[in-house]
Amino acid sequence: MAEGGGGVGVVYVLENEAYLSKEGGTLKVSRRAGREVLLQKPLIAVEEIVILGNAVVTPALLKHCAQEGVGIHYLSPTGTYYAGLTRTPSKNAPARVAQFKAYLEPTWKLALAQRFVLGKIRNGLVFLRRNGAEGWERLKEALLEAERAQDEEALRGAEGRAADLYFRAFAELLPEEFAFGERSRRPPRDPANSLLSLAYTLLAKECESALLVAGLDPYVGYLHEVRYGRPSLALDLMEEFRSVLADSVVLSLLNNRRVTLEDFDDSEGFPRLRKEAWPKFLRAWEGRLNERIQHPLLGKRLAYREILLAQARILVKHLLGELPRYEPFAVR
């Protein structure tokens, strides 16, 4: 089975042993080397391909995607990011030079890390307040602590305390059968954490794509430590969007009973979303990304997917000296 992504050119391939090929100007997704066609879509309308599970991609399609900047992303059934073919960086070399310079200057690096943390805490606070969570006001203390942080250790301490308070309150918003004690990952210990991990993986992928389009290197960040193979800047950028996009989708799916406990399989010792339930999750995810709202800084209505790119470009403007500081996206 294959899912088209809301008219924005994202194709999700859910079928195990799917066969992806290029036939003329068309992407063809079939079962077992062409025996049963699952999806045909003009390649000009394909911006990204997300593969969950095992699939074969023909050399001709790989070549096309590499030449045209179409990302191919491999995820496990639990949403873990395995590998990907991403678009080549833009020609904006000055942006990357400025990015590396900021990373090497401790004061600048700390200031950027602080902006990402503040964006995360502020939006998390608004999210909890809007949803009527008890204890949302406690995040104000962590916010003040982050604002006053003078070094990375203090900043990360404030972020950690804010995250602990946030997830305690978030868990109380969930249906009783999905409540959890703390955030868990690798592997997630309960269905709600499993959905959160999945949503965060997809959000990180979106942020990585936005940064590449804007001309930045997703692997050199400021808040998250730089490690081999870790998209640190993508993880930085996604912080201000965790509650706005990922947590919002998960909360809506669970509270509206669109995803239930029966949609999870724990035969491998941890819960994971059944293949049959993936379309429900992906429809909700794409629906949220395509939702349009007013961007507070730019003063115009944009889809959330466009806002991710807008924020990446705002970061570029700051790095190049066109803005005095990076302004995180803020919900009202």
From Swiss-Prot:
Its EC number is 3.1.-.-. Mn(2+) binds at residues 159, 224, 239. Keywords: Antiviral defense, DNA-binding, Endonuclease, Hydrolase, Magnesium, Manganese, Metal-binding, Nuclease, Plasmid. The keyword Nuclease applies. It comes from the Bacteria. Signal peptide: none annotated. Its cofactor is Mg(2+); Mn(2+). GO terms for biological process: defense response to virus; maintenance of CRISPR repeat elements. Transmembrane segments: none annotated. GO terms for molecular function: DNA binding; endonuclease activity; metal ion binding. Belongs to the CRISPR-associated endonuclease Cas1 family. CRISPR (clustered regularly interspaced short palindromic repeat), is an adaptive immune system that provides protection against mobile genetic elements (viruses, transposable elements and conjugative plasmids). CRISPR clusters contain spacers, sequences complementary to antecedent mobile elements, and target invading nucleic acids. CRISPR clusters are transcribed and processed into CRISPR RNA (crRNA). Acts as a dsDNA endonuclease. Involved in the integration of spacer DNA into the CRISPR cassette. Homodimer, forms a heterotetramer with a Cas2 homodimer. HAMAP family: Cas1. This is CRISPR-associated endonuclease Cas1 3.
